[in-house]
C-alpha cells in the first residue's frame, strides 16, 4: 500500500513538472529588456563560423517569412517565448 502511494505521488509530481515546462509563457521583449534577455540567454553559446553560413547564401530565396523578420519583429511587436529568443543566439 505504501509503495503504491509513493509511486502515485512520484507520477503526479513528474507529470506536473512536465506540463509546467510545456506551457512556456510568451511575452514581449523590447529595448533594454530584449538586449539584456538575449545577452543572458546567449552567454556561452558558441558563435557560428563562416562555413556554417555557406548554405544560407544559396538557399536564402527559399527561406520562409522568418528569414525576412528579425528578433524585434518576432519578440517586441508580438509576444514570443524564450525558445524563439534562443534561436537568435550564435
Curated annotation (Swiss-Prot):
User: Which positions correspond to the propeptide?
Assistant: 49-67
What intrachain disulfides are recorded?
30-76, 42-89, 75-80
InterPro entries (UniProt xref): Bombyxin, Bombyxin_B, Insulin-like, Insulin-like_sf, Insulin_CS, Insulin_family
Signal peptide location:
1-20
Q: Does this UniProt record's set of keywords contain Translocase?
A: no
Q: Which Pfam families match?
A: Insulin
Q: Choose any GO biological process term that the UniProt entry carries and state it.
A: positive regulation of MAPK cascade
Q: Does the keyword Chaperone apply?
A: no
Task: Spell out the CDD domains in the cross-references.
Answer: IlGF_insulin_bombyxin_like (cd04366)
* Main localization of the protein described in the UniProt heading: secreted
Q: Which SUPFAM superfamilies match?
A: Insulin-like
Molecular function terms from GO: growth factor activity; hormone activity; insulin-like growth factor receptor binding; protein serine/threonine kinase activator activity
The alphabetized UniProt keywords are: Cleavage on pair of basic residues, Disulfide bond, Hormone, Secreted, Signal
Choose one Gene Ontology CC annotation of this protein and give it: extracellular space
**UniProt subcellular location:** Secreted
The record describes its quaternary structure and partners as: Heterodimer of a B chain and an A chain linked by two disulfide bonds.
The entry's function note states: Brain peptide responsible for activation of prothoracic glands to produce ecdysone in insects.
For this chain, the family text in UniProt reads: Belongs to the insulin family.
What more is known? Silk worm has two kinds of PTTH: 4K-PTTH and 22K-PTTH; there are many forms of 4K-PTTH.
What's the protein called, per UniProt? Bombyxin B-6
Amino acid at each position: 500500500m505504501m509503495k503504491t502511494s509513493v509511486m502515485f505521488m512520484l507520477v503526479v509530481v513528474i507529470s506536473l513538472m512536465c506540463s509546467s515546462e510545456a506551457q512556456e509563457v510568451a511575452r514581449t521583449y523590447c529595448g533594454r529588456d530584449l538586449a539584456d534577455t538575449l545577452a543572458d540567454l546567449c552567454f556561452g553559446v558558441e558563435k557560428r563560423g563562416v562555413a556554417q553560413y555557406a548554405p544560407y547564401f544559396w538557399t536564402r530565396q527559399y527561406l520562409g517569412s522568418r528569414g525576412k523578420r528579425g528578433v524585434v519583429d518576432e519578440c517586441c511587436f508580438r509576444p514570443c517565448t524564450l525558445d524563439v529568443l534562443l534561436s537568435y543566439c550564435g
